[in-house]
Amino acid sequence: MAETSLNLTDPNLATITSMRDLAAGIKLVQVRLDDPEERKRFVYEPGQFAEVSVFGVGESPFGLASSAERGDTLEFAVNKVGTVTEELFRLDVGDQVGIRGPLGHGFPMHEFKGKDILILGGGIGGAPLRPVIQTILDHRTDYGKLTILWAARSPDLLVFTEEYDLWTSEPNVTMHLTVDKATPDWQHDEGLITALIEKIKPSPENTITITCGPPIMIKFAMLTLEKVGFIPGQNWVTLEAKMKCGIGKCGRCNMGGVFICTEGPVFCFEKVSQFLESFV
């Protein structure tokens, strides 16, 4: 976890600076902490998250969707699926929210230097992977080949589509897209991300994999990666589905004695592989 002296139990005021459609039913919400000193202290790693409060309604955890190195705003991908997110959708630029964080542990990017990176993103699970991609691109010579596998149920649910050309314009970066159900004008793969893994057959040599998506996707992606030669110690996952309080108090994200919100949400799969059947 990045060093911070922020109060992790009380929210800090933040103002919405931008809201835009990211995909069908998903918005990208950008906020800036009101206190300049709090902004300076809000240092985080790719993969960490924060609790976003809608005052008078409640709070929910969201993965940070932008790199801390790219300015003093925070971005979150919000899927309209519950009371808090419905109220977030009603807010606009200039409205205030509360922010608690940064929370959890992120990806140890320093450990990945010199490695080839294979990224697997499913649906809105691509949002916490965007700062990973940004970090690799901003420090391109520190990392080897970057391969991105991006999946969604349908083309209109793919996130950050306007950035794909920018990502792949960088040296030694390739991207493969797949959807469960293609539209007539779809020009990429159709099917599950597991089929895409088997199709491109990524080499496990000197490679780290990073995966975020629905739990069922993570489960079968891990099985498929093993099938093509990867071992659990090469695979990193972020597990966000059951988090609530963010500080290990409510117990909702307890998985076999492991608290996802405090010990994760990022894990080397080697640590959580015994809970594979829980990934549903």
State each model region's role.
Residues 256-280:
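Non-heme iron-sulfur electron-transfer modules
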